[in-house]
Amino acid sequence: PKELNKILKDDSSEKPFIVDVREDDEIAIASFSFSVLHLPLSKAANWSAKIGELLPKDQPIVVVCHAGVRSLNFGIWLLEQGITKRVWNLVGGIDAWSTDVDQSVPRY
């Protein structure tokens, strides 16, 4: 989380495209203060066929969830589908973001 925060604040670094795979009820509890693409995994049938259109080809992608497990699996899927070669998982998810970077983000 601290490394991502540093990248987001550094004007000279390439900004990642952030995908949040948590569910709607989780987003309602805790959300990031910056822009993310929300793709809840439970609704993958609605967006999986057009995933290549939803994600940028020229930006690194950071995938997030609550603790980092669902986002890790989604990141692996993106690699397997050939969608991107530059994908990272936010280890610890929004929970770690809350403890390590922004304590105003509620924990659940």
Model-derived features: positions:
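Short, surface-exposed ligand- or partner-binding patches at beta-edge/loop junctions that are enriched
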Residues: 64
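Rhodanese-like catalytic fold shared by cysteine-dependent sulfurtransferases
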Residues: 1-17, 24-60, 69-108
